[in-house]
Structure formats: C-alpha cells, structure tokens
C-alpha cells in the first residue's frame, strides 16, 4: 500500500510485544471503555500498545481526537481500515474497494454520491415503515411469552430488519445472519492466518458467502426494481457512468448491512439494559410515545421525540458503539509533544472523551438530562459527542439508525414494561461493536 508497516515508537509511553498485545486486546473485548480509561490513566493521553496483532498509537485527549477525526490531509481512514480487514476480502490486497469505510478523497466522494440518494428522506421513510412493522411483530411475540433473552433476540431481529429494508426480502434473514456475524467478528482475531485461526477462517468464509448471495441478485433487481436499498442501488449503479461497478455495489451493500445490523443491535441491547435498570426513564419515554398524535408512528414522529432521543444519546455515551476512530498517518504528524511517524496506525479514543470529567458532569452516571438545551454538555467541545463520526466520514445512515431506534422504542414501550430477570452490574465490552455485557434477559409484561 506504499506505507511503512514498522515504525520506531519507542519514544512514546506505553507497552508493546506479544504479551502486551494479547492483554490489551482481551482488555478491550472484556472491559471496553473501562480498560481504555485505565490505559489512559496509566500512560497518559498518547501511548503505544498492541491491538489484534497491530502496533497502535492511542490518543485520548479531546483536541487530539478531533484533529485525528477531521484532518484528512494528515490521517487516512482508508489505509487504517484496509489494514484492519486485509485478508478477509482478497480484493483488499489489490485496493479495489468501493465501501466508504475503505476510501478517502475522490473515491470516497464518489461512493457517497451513490449511497446518498438511497438514504434520502423519502427512501428513509420507506425503510422506517418496514422496520416498524417488524419491531411491532417482535414485541408482540415477546409480550406473549413474557420473557426474552434480548441480546440474542435483537441481533436476529436486526438481521431480519436489514434483509427487509436493504434487500426487500422476508425469508433471507437466516442465510444472511450467519454470514454477517462471521464476517463482522473476524477483525478481532488475534491470529490473522486462516490456517491457525478459526475466527479468521470463518470471517473469510462469511464475506465470500455474502458476496455470492448479493451478486446472484443483481440482474433480477435491475430488471424488476423495488423500494429496498439494494434495488435502488442496482438501478443507480447500472447508469452511474462507472462510479461503482457490480463488485463495488456488492461491497457497498455488505458495508451498509454489516454496520446497520451490528451497531443498531448493540445500541439497542445497551439501551434496553439501562431502561430495565431505570424504570422511571422507561416510563418517561413511554409517556412521550403515547402522547404522539398519529394513530401509527411515522418517520416524522421519530424526528420529534425529545426524551427518547436524550436516552438514546446517553446510551451511546455510556456504552459507545464505535469506541474509536481508526486512521493511519500519511506523513509524520505531531500529537501533543510526540512525533508520530508516517504509516502509524492511530486510534482516536472517542470513548475516553465520552467519560472525560472535564466535559461531562459525573460521567459514570446515567443522566439523559445532560443533553437538554439548558445543560448541553455534548456542546462543551467539538469532540465531546461523536457517535456517528464527523466531517466527510460521518455515517451515511445516521438518520436511519436514529429513526430505527425510535421505531423500536415505540413498538416496545407502548406495548409493555420490562425488567431484568436477574439484575446484574454490567460493563462496556467490545465484540466488535461496543455493547453492554451479559445476555440482557428480560421479564416482559403487557401494559
């Protein structure tokens, strides 16, 4: 890729080596943000470590995180994620990629041009209606049973939602679920060789299967059309003057589906845990949702909710889904008083900023009111709250993700109240999206 892979980082505080890499990777997976805060306290705002087989520099200072997230002339998103996923998809080795996650500059702008119409207001409203119906049916099943192992159930449900709104299919969820999960979990493998790592081998297999499933559908979608994202993209890329070919189309959809199912299911698991622990906030959200004028929730309704959105934001602060922004240095860059060599793999620790006591009042406490206009703690620094990124790499599906969460809240909270079967003290984990620990097993009672 034209970038150095070995750099002298000995001038930085921290630790490296196989033992440190295993310890740090397991710390991320098991203890998430708590592990990162402990590392920050031990080594300072900039330190070197190992993660999932790579040498990494971590930055926890808000100004540094903002600089890393916004400065596209010094930091490359493309090279970071290409490095992280290299070996899962054979085409990564030839840098023939079209997912916005793997691109910078003009290719990134071209990919977003293809995606943005498929995430416009009208399209997102259609996706919202389809998702709401599935959420309502699931909530009814859980109420009828009186209990649900929520983390497992929501993961399966979100694959079902993704295949409905992104592919327009109702029966494809089971075959996509296994492939998506296998693919998504691969980058956390400590050994990145399919001969010695079952997780890495499964990830390669999952990606290959996703490509097969999607490629087999392209011709029929171009012929028949549809309101789902895949059909819209098939129609657009068939006449897009070569911005994205069919391989690129497949990669775009894999990127969207992977991000959508994993991140939204993780966020909802964390939010439901918090609401089970804080029934007063569960009731406040319920009252706001029941007060809507519409006989059935609409996409416009989802954008008008205040209490529900504050709870969702506080969930993403306490249990960040994306704990860091990954970059590689395009040239030698200064982070504080340290010189970072070109090619260095760098993580801007968004999750550490989300617990910074200089920005957040009692940051360990669940307090959605910190997002009110009066307190506006999320406005104290431009890097204080970046759950969907910033600048050109802001998540294209941000509005859909927020709307999906509001739709789920309406489906669940207007039908039932819920509590934990066995209360437990949860922690933030990373597997590979940030998520609350434990199974989140619920007792569910009809209103």
Model-derived features with residue positions:
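Cytochrome P450 catalytic-domain helical core, especially the substrate-recognition surface
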Residues: 2-37, 55, 82-220, 247, ...
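Cytochrome P450 catalytic-core helices
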Residues: 261-288, 398-415
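Conserved cytochrome P450 catalytic core segment spanning the I/J/K helices
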Residues: 20, 120, 207-267, 282, ...
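Cytochrome P450 proximal C-terminal region
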Residues: 9-12, 40, 135, 179, ...
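Cytochrome P450 catalytic domain signature, combining two hallmark sequence patches
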Residues: 66-87
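Conserved cytochrome P450 K-helix/beta-meander segment immediately N-terminal to the heme-binding cysteine loop
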Residues: 74, 348-376
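Cytochrome P450 I-helix active-site segment
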Residues: 13-18, 227, 274-322, 336, ...
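Cytochrome P450 heme-thiolate "Cys pocket" and heme-binding signature region
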Residues: 97, 101, 296-300, 338, ...
């Amino acid at each position: 890729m034209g970038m150095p892979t070995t750099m002298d980082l000995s001038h930085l505080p921290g630790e490296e080596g196989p033992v440190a890499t295993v310890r740090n990777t397991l710390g991320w997976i098991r203890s998430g943000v708590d592990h990162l805060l402990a590392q920050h306290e031990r080594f300072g705002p900039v330190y070197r470590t190992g993660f999932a087989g790579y040498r990494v520099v971590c930055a926890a200072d808000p100004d540094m995180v903002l600089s890393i997230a916004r400065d596209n002339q010094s930091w490359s998103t493309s090279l970071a994620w290409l490095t992280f996923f290299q070996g899962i998809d054979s085409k990564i080795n030839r840098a023939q990629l079209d997912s916005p996650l793997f691109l910078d500059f003009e290719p990134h702008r071209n990919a977003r041009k293809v995606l943005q119409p498929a995430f416009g207001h009208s399209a997102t409203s259609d996706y919202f209606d389809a998702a709401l119906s599935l959420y309502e049916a699931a909530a009814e099943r859980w109420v009828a049973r009186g209990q649900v192992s929520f983390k497992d159930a929501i993961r399966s449900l979100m694959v079902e939602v993704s295949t409905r709104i992104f592919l327009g299919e109702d029966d494809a969820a089971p075959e996509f679920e296994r492939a998506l999960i296998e693919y998504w979990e691969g980058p956390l493998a400590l050994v990145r060789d399919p001969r010695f790592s079952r997780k890495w081998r499964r990830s390669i297999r999952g990606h290959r299967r996703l490509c097969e499933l999607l490629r087999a559908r392209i011709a029929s979608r171009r012929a028949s059309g549809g309101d789902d994202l895949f059909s819209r993209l098939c129609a657009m890329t068939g006449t897009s003057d070569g911005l994205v070919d069919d391989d690129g189309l497949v990669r775009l959809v894999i990127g969207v589906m992977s991000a959508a199912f994993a991140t939204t299911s993780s966020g909802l698991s964390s939010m439901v845990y918090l609401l089970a622990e804080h029934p007063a906030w569960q009731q406040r959200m319920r009252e706001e949702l029941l007060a809507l004028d519409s006989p059935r929730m609409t996409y416009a309704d989802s954008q008008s909710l205040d209490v529900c959105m504050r709870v969702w934001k506080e969930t993403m602060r306490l249990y960040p889904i994306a704990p860091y922004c990954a970059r590689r240095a395009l040239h030698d860059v200064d982070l504080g008083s340290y010189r970072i060599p070109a090619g260095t793999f760098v993580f801007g620790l968004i999750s550490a900023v989300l617990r910074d006591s200089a920005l957040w009042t009692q940051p360990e406490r669940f307090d959605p009111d910190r997002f009110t206009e009066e307190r506006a703690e999320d406005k104290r620094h431009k890097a204080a709250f970046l759950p969907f990124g910033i600048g050109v790499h802001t998540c294209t599906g941000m509005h859909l993700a927020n709307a999906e969460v509001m739709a789920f809240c309406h489906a669940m909270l207007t039908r039932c109240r819920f509590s934990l079967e066995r209360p437990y003290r949860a922690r933030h984990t990373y597997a590979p999206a940030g998520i609350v620990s434990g199974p989140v097993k619920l007792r569910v009672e009809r209103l």
